From Swiss-Prot:
UniProt domain OBG-type G: residue ranges: 160-334
Gene Ontology biological-process entries: ribosome biogenesis
Organism: Dichelobacter nodosus (strain VCS1703A)
Binding site for Mg(2+): 173, 193
Protein name: GTPase Obg
Task performed by this protein: An essential GTPase which binds GTP, GDP and possibly (p)ppGpp with moderate affinity, with high nucleotide exchange rates and a fairly low GTP hydrolysis rate. Plays a role in control of the cell cycle, stress response, ribosome biogenesis and in those bacteria that undergo differentiation, in morphogenesis control.
Amino acid sequence: MRFVDEVVINVKAGKGGNGIVSFRREKYIEFGGPDGGDGGDGGSVYLRASDGLNTLSDFRYTRHFEAENGAAGEGRNKRGRSGEDLYIDVPLGTQVFVAETDELMGDLTAVGQTLLVAKGGFHGIGNTRYKSSVNRAPRQCKAGGLGEERVIRLELKLLADVGLLGMPNAGKSTLIAQVSSAKPKIADYPFTTLHPNLGVVRVGALQSFVMADIPGLIAGAADGMGLGHQFLRHLARNRILLHLLDCSPMSDSQNPITDFEQVSAELIKYDADFAQIPRWLVLNKMDTLPPELWQQKQEEIVRALNWQGKVFSISAAAGIGTAELCTAIMQELTAMKANQTAENDEPNAPELI
């Protein structure tokens, strides 16, 4: 299935049902008076966040959505049936914009969360409502209002705890395949990954986190070079970024220091807020070096980058060091959640009067 993370759709709410002109007609009652009922309200259109979707590909072939119209009123003061609301399921992490103005309408980040994108038309009014002391037989009614119609843009930002960052062939897809049930395409050439992959990483029997792998970045990615720029937005919601470096023996075209600097520059150029997301350094393909050189290699890279954060040496292909990495990630995510809960529960300071 093709991965789609941005789409434009048209939504139209239902029209309100018309009110009607009607008079009571019964045997032996010559002047029964008005009994025209109101129409029903038009159905509204809502977007609803679903955890069963991870792409907007369902919207490739269906771009127009319309809620049901309200029914007209009836005699005997019967109100018309309201149109049924339309709920459109979208993936978690979908942002909704007015296509014409780029105004943000909402951000769907919780399962079951809904967003009204087109309100149904108001019901029409029957002639009973116009009866008064001076107008006992009104022959006027009001039509139902039109429902809202608008063109909206849906933009998906995947919700993942951990995002994988790095140059093409740094081993990101190999890592996510090693630690989760995700099955990305893996091959020994650049840009094997053509779209983001999500995997659930289980740590122990009860704990897990979600990992996201996007296509590798190259110099100029923020300006549209390569493939990764199309999917950089999916890293914006991650709580931890793992920056993978290929540490296999250097060639003329491969240098982990240069690779790190290029990817870091493109990341910040795309969005400076990425600097606020914790980033861990992951030195991959260390099994291509003799074991006695691992520590030396790690120290050389850390010193060259003046790296102050966390660093791990692994081999994603061989599964060396990956369990320790995932355990550390789970511990960090648990601590983050605990800190956030404590901040939310902290009482506000009393106001001084």
